[in-house]
Amino acid sequence: KIGNSERLTIFGGVNVIESKELIFEVAEAFIKNSSKLKFNFVFKASFDKANRSSLDSYRGPGLEDGLKILSELKQKYNLPILTDIHEPHQAKPVSEVCDIIQIPAFLCRQTDLVVEAAKTGKIINLKKPQFMSAKEIFHVVKKCESVGNKNIILCERGNIFGYNNLVVDILNFQIMKESTKPVFFDVTHSLQQPGTLEKSTGGRGEYVLELAKAGISQGIAGLFLETHPDPSKALCDGPCAVSYTHLTLPTTPYV
């Protein structure tokens, strides 16, 4: 069960599917820690990163091959799966494999996309855009509810602070909790430094523990964390990824 008063849930995995072997390895690392630290676990991976800085950037295996890999992972480990969609037509096939459909932050105002995702009846994870206030996300919630879907999660991922930087307003957690929806904290992407690596996004992954502690202290439902066996070699958002050594996260609120 996912909720602000329930046991912490981690949406954990990789930024994008690089290979079947890699995501299976990452899933096993999270499963091991979820058992030891007693948090609920949902595996996250993208089949396509449509929003990349450069045309040369790696995007992923695509819808068909990506869903096949996610389906195999789900069957092997009996895990709930989260992935994101970028176009309305992707909602139906994704809903046949995944338990949670994520709306990317940059696409959260795309009404057709949001509505098609909501029509599947799946849990919808709404990533609050970097350019949007906490209260504005409530309009997106209404779009989902307009087609009868009240299974909605709100996810904080920082706000634009000048050029090439993001900051997290800690008050956003309490504002979003006013909706009574489960609130998550995307620690990984809140540490982005967009455009700082010329053709890709930089980041400050070394501060993941500090931000994770701050988020947990707000009594939220869970954290969103992406990892990689070697972040320096990750094909997308490596500078923001959590190293395996940092997967041992605090799971009780800090006072």
Model-identified regions with their sequence ranges:
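Single conserved hydrophobic/aromatic residue that forms the stacking wall/gate
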Residues: 246-255
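Catalytic alpha/beta core domains of metabolic enzymes, predominantly
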Residues: 129-224
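N-terminal amphipathic alpha-helix/helix-capping segment at the start of soluble metabolic enzymes
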Residues: 1-10
